Design a protein with these regions (language model features):
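N-terminally biased helix-coil "hinge/interface" segments that flank
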Residues: 1-236
Length: 236
């Protein structure tokens, strides 16, 4: 017999995308580059300054505030493909030319290219071909803000977190606290699901209000009426 680990992945990590949609926070499963990493590579403050000046132009979603930069492929140093092989449109070439200068947000790209809405900016093919890199708010940036991590540029992370907190009408500490609560609840829920569901059938992923309240009770060590606890039969 071959010994193996019985694994179940959750899709949460330091590079998980943190999004704000209508003041509702979500974490993952998409992965993006942390803005602290971007700030270590190049100056992103002009892009964030633009977002601050146009803060009323993206009221319902944080996606247009995500930042884009040209990769080494997009800069041409390692492309290995001719323009004809890449078959980029004039608009896509324009995006790459802009990003070779400095990072831009999706909102500013739309404004710079004279498009009516940021959703019209054609970045998806460029992402798929690794010609540009998407950056945004991640748990790594929040750890830089807390002083618990010192890998990259904490100043850029602070600048960006302050912007998104203002846009979402959260305080910086409130936003940070809520994100880590979401991560904690997700990890705890998946740990319990893995132990409770036999075999590989983990398809019961619908939201359950009672289940969520039970997880919160366990993590918060109870409330005035009830205290729940969990004991695993082996290490996890």
């Amino acid at each position: 017999h071959v010994r193996a680990l019985n694994l179940h992945t959750v899709g949460l990590g330091g590079d998980s995308e943190i999004k704000i949609e209508e003041q509702v926070l979500s974490v993952g499963p998409k992965r993006i580059a942390p803005v602290s990493w971007l700030g270590e590579k190049m100056d992103a403050h002009k892009a964030i300054d633009f977002l601050e000046r146009h803060i009323d132009d993206y009221s319902s979603s944080s996606e247009p505030a995500q930042l884009f930069s040209a990769t080494s492929f997009g800069n041409g140093s390692e492309a290995g493909h001719s323009d004809s092989e890449l078959a980029l449109t004039d608009q896509e070439h324009h995006i790459i030319d802009l990003l070779r200068e400095r990072p831009y947000s999706l909102l500013e790209l739309g404004w710079k290219m004279g498009m009516g809405h940021w959703m019209m900016v054609p970045v998806h093919k460029l992402e798929e071909r690794h010609l540009l890199q998407r950056s945004g708010l991640t748990p790594t940036d929040l750890l830089h803000h807390r002083g618990q991590l010192d890998l990259w540029d904490a100043e850029t992370a602070e600048h960006y977190i302050r912007l998104l907190s203002r846009r979402a009408k959260y305080g910086m500490e409130e936003l940070t606290k809520r994100v880590f609560e979401i991560i904690e609840e997700r990890v705890a829920t998946e740990l319990l699901r893995k132990q409770l569901v036999h075999g590989d059938d983990l398809s019961t992923k619908g939201k359950c209000g009672l289940c969520g309240e039970m997880v919160k009770n366990i993590l918060c060590r109870g409330n005035e009426s009830l205290t729940l606890s969990v004991r695993f039969h082996y290490p996890v």
